[in-house]
């Protein structure tokens, strides 16, 4: 997401396609154009990138979204910012470039996490359990309350009785961050409030 002239309608089409395809998991990220690529040059040409202000040392091109998300959470730990609601925009409106990280969060939730509540297939639940465990351990260092919470949910659906620690960790991070508290409230995840 984040391509030039991408609209909310385009974003909703992406969400609908992902939902229709019903894969186990989707990797979603914000476009990070590399210098010396055609897309970078096009974005610079139409004014979406100021080449004079780009500091390539600040961008993690390998896993941009994870790094950006961590920075966003740290910078907003004590501030209350409006949570975007994808459906509150008209389909023709263009994605606001300065809000792509928050939009990424909402898209990631819509296509990866929301469906977990109704998942019944044991093979898929087992895959999700392994995947969420990896996200929590390796990618977020047990600091993302959404992935912690959904690992708890998946393991409960699999019949595990030892998931309270995951729920406690998730609640700790929600209580420690106004940004996470807003997100959890926006997603109506009452068990985390």
Segments (PLM) and residue ranges:
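A generic structural motif
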Residues: 28-31, 181-185
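"A position-specific structural signal for the A-helix of alpha-solenoid helical repeats
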Residues: 146-150, 182-186
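Residues that mark the junctions of alpha-helical repeat units in TPR/alpha-solenoid scaffolds
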Residues: 137-146, 176, 180
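A structural motif corresponding to the C-terminal lobe/cap of the Radical SAM core domain
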Residues: 1-133, 137-139, 161-168, 172, ...
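C-terminal non-catalytic interaction modules
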Residues: 171, 175, 183-193
């Amino acid at each position: 997401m984040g391509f030039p002239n991408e609209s909310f309608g385009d974003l909703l089409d992406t969400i609908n396609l992902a939902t229709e395809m019903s894969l186990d998991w989707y990797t979603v990220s914000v476009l990070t154009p590399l210098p010396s690529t055609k897309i970078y040059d096009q974005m610079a040409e139409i004014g979406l990138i100021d080449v004079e202000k780009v500091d390539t040392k600040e961008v993690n091109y390998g896993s941009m979204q994870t790094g950006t998300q961590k920075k966003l959470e740290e910078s907003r730990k004590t501030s209350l910012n409006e949570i975007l609601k994808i459906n509150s925009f008209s389909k023709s409106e263009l994605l606001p470039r300065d809000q792509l990280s928050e939009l990424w969060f909402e898209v990631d939730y819509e296509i990866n996490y929301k469906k977990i509540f109704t998942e019944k297939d044991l093979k898929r639940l087992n895959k999700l359990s392994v995947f969420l465990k990896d996200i929590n351990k390796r990618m977020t260092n047990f600091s993302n309350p959404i992935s912690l919470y959904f690992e708890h949910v998946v393991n409960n659906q699999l019949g595990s009785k030892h998931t309270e620690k995951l729920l406690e960790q998730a609640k700790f991070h929600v209580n420690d961050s106004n940004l996470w508290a807003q997100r959890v409230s926006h997603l109506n995840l009452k068990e985390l409030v």
